[in-house]
């Protein structure tokens, strides 16, 4: 995103021969992508997976029959199916299990240890039940956690580190992440368990704690729920469970782990095919030969696939990666490689949807505009087929809003103007690009999206506004951390300090992080509350926001994709499980 700094690059004519990105180049050569070969899509693997699904369903029925600890066993089953990424095969079983648990759920006390009739309320079972029920949109109150405080109003634990207690604290930590605005007890639970679990990992007296459980604790602290996307979580938990010998003693658990590995590899094989189509599309385009922008089409594919991985959303994923690639080209053009006058002409060309308006601009800008029109028109035609109506006017209006926000930033830079924080955030939400990125993808998820439903999931809906705000805050917060080292200031930080001269840069950064924390809680609420929007649409938008938290966890993973981001790509997209 454009930085509010003493930059004169947009006020002077640029030498076209010197137009080159200062970021590292493409890491994923098309020849390498096309060379990805795997037999995991062969019929025998699909047949084995289908057989395992049926075996596990039968084992579920058998193990739950006349079970003395039926509530906790059902919750553990739901949790492991979800952590291993195979829950889509057992939606009926999960629904039945949670309906059963909810029948015995007490809003003030939770559920008991052992059987459903137990009067002894259990910390672990209640926290696990709360998390599962809330994520599946049952009405559960966080007040239930008040039961597990002492007379001083603090959560309690023993002075010794025991495996059962570590498990309880881990479960409570995971539950506390699904909080809504104003839930003080959830904030208290998160602070308490974070401190406890951190001490467990750094302590020396943990010999009585299973190493597999310690790996779970390490994962939970390093990758909290809002950056623990389904594919990332599945790969990580498959590896954790595979090292847990005591867990693997169960026949059912062995079958579950075998299915999880098989399912992961089958999906990865399908994702290879999509990645190859995407790579061919990019490498065969004229824009591929230009060097002024970040070439990150594979990274953008990872962003979407870690959250929306199901086979039926193939077109949605490829579209998401294409639009992200296009937006990055525009981002780098408006940020660095176009003069203000050139950008005004480019923006007007988009408003009129007219290639002739850019005839007199440099070749790299004309190539960019032609790539923009070709890509947009191709996808608009695809949308018309899927939605059974012409959506071009709606889509074009969204592009206008996006590029007008970029142009506003370019004008601020050219004038050396630092806007107020509110002005910056209002414009920055639009320039985040989430509006156009989510629009194409939602329209190509394979379901009809009537106008009234579209208004509830896209702009100006609350959930969409929160996704846009998340993108802006994540980007600005990480820009501050990484760019202040080189003497540059991330825009939101600088604007806040201008409005509040008594604040330090760290104060401003903390303010943005506080806004992000509140935004996450509001997103949780929008995600789980019942309305007329199909859950698949909500999950998509929600996981796009969560994906940014993972990609920006250590640094801007799009700017610098040759470190953690590269590792993520190999883990999720390249290397199969063995």
Swiss-Prot record:
Its cofactor is Mg(2+); Mn(2+). It catalyses: (2E,6E)-farnesyl diphosphate = longifolene + diphosphate. Disulfide bonds: none annotated. It comes from the Eukaryota. Mg(2+) 1 binds at residues 331, 335. Keywords: Cytoplasm, Lyase, Magnesium, Metal-binding. Binds 3 Mg(2+) or Mn(2+) ions per subunit. GO terms for biological process: diterpenoid biosynthetic process; sesquiterpenoid biosynthetic process. Mg(2+) 3 binds at residue 475. One of its GO terms (molecular function) is magnesium ion binding. Pathway: Sesquiterpene biosynthesis; Terpene metabolism; oleoresin biosynthesis. It is found in: Cytoplasm. SUPFAM superfamilies: Terpenoid cyclases/Protein prenyltransferases, Terpenoid synthases. Its EC number is 4.2.3.58. A motif (DDXXD motif) lies at residues 331-335. It is an enzyme of class 4 (lyase). The Asp-Asp-Xaa-Xaa-Asp/Glu (DDXXD/E) motif is important for the catalytic activity, presumably through binding to Mg(2+). Involved in defensive oleoresin formation in conifers in response to insect attack or other injury. Involved in sesquiterpene (C15) olefins biosynthesis. Produces mainly longifolene, but also multiple minor products including alpha-longipinene, alpha-longicyclene, E-beta-farnesene, longiborneol, cyclosativene, beta-longipinene, and 12 other sesquiterpenes when used with farnesyl diphosphate (FPP) as substrate. Belongs to the terpene synthase family. Tpsd subfamily. This is Longifolene synthase. The gene is TPS-Lon.
């Amino acid at each position: 995103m454009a930085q509010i700094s003493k930059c004169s690059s947009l006020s002077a004519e640029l030498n076209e021969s010197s137009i080159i990105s200062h970021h590292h180049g493409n890491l994923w050569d098309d020849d390498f992508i096309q060379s990805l070969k795997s037999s995991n899509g062969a019929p025998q693997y699909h047949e084995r997976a289908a057989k395992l699904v049926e075996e596990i369903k039968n084992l579920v029925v058998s193990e739950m029959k006349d079970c003395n600890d039926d509530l906790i066993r059902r919750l553990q089953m739901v949790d492991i199916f979800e952590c291993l990424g195979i829950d889509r095969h057992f939606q009926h079983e999960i629904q039945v299990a949670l309906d059963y648990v909810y029948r015995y759920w007490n809003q003030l006390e939770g559920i008991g240890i052992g059987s459903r009739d137990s009067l002894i309320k259990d910390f672990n079972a209640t926290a696990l039940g709360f998390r599962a029920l809330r994520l599946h949109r049952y009405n559960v109150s966080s007040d239930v956690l008040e039961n597990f405080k002492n007379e001083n109003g603090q959560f309690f634990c023993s002075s010794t580190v025991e495996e059962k207690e570590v498990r309880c604290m881990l479960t409570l930590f995971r539950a506390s992440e699904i909080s809504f605005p104003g839930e003080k007890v959830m904030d208290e639970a998160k602070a308490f368990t974070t401190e406890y679990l951190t001490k467990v990992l750094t302590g020396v007296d943990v010999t009585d704690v299973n190493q597999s459980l310690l790996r779970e604790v390490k994962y939970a602290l390093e990758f909290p729920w809002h950056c623990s996307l389904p594919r990332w979580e599945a790969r990580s938990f498959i590896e954790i469970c595979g090292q847990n010998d005591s867990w693997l003693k169960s026949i059912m658990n062995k079958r579950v782990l075998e299915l999880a590995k098989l399912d992961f590899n089958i999906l990865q094989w399908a994702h290879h095919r999509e990645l190859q189509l995407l790579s061919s599309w990019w490498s065969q385009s004229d824009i591929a030969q230009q060097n002024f922008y970040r070439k990150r089409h594979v990274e953008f594919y990872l962003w979407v696939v870690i959250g929306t991985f199901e086979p039926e959303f193939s077109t949605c994923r490829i579209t998401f990666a294409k639009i992200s690639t296009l937006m990055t080209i525009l981002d780098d053009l408006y940020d660095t490689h176009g003069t203000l006058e050139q950008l005004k002409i480019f923006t007007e060309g988009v408003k009129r949807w007219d290639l002739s308006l850019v005839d007199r601009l440099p070749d790299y800008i004309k190539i960019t505009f032609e790539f923009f029109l070709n890509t947009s028109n191709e996808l608009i035609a695809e949308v018309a087929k899927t939605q059974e109506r012409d959506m071009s006017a709606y889509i074009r209006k969204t592009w206008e809003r996006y590029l007008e926000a970029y142009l506003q930033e370019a004008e601020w830079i050219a004038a050396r103007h630092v806007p107020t924080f509110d002005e910056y955030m209002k414009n920055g939400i639009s320039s985040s690009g989430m509006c156009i990125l989510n629009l194409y993808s939602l329209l190509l998820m394979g379901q009809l999206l009537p106008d009234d439903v579209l208004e509830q999931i896209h702009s100006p809906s609350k959930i969409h506004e929160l996704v846009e705000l998340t993108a802006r805050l994540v980007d600005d917060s990480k820009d501050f951390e990484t760019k202040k080292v080189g003497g540059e200031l991330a825009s939101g930080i600088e604007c806040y300090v201008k409005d509040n001269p008594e604040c330090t840069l760290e104060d401003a950064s903390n303010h943005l992080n506080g806004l992000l924390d509140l935004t996450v809680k509001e997103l949780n609420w929008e995600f789980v509350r019942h309305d007329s929007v199909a859950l698949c649409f909500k999950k998509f938008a929600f996981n796009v926001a969560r994906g940014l938290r993972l990609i920006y966890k250590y640094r801007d993973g799009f700017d610098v994709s040759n470190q953690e981001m590269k590792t993520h790509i190999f883990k999720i997209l390249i290397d199969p499980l063995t």
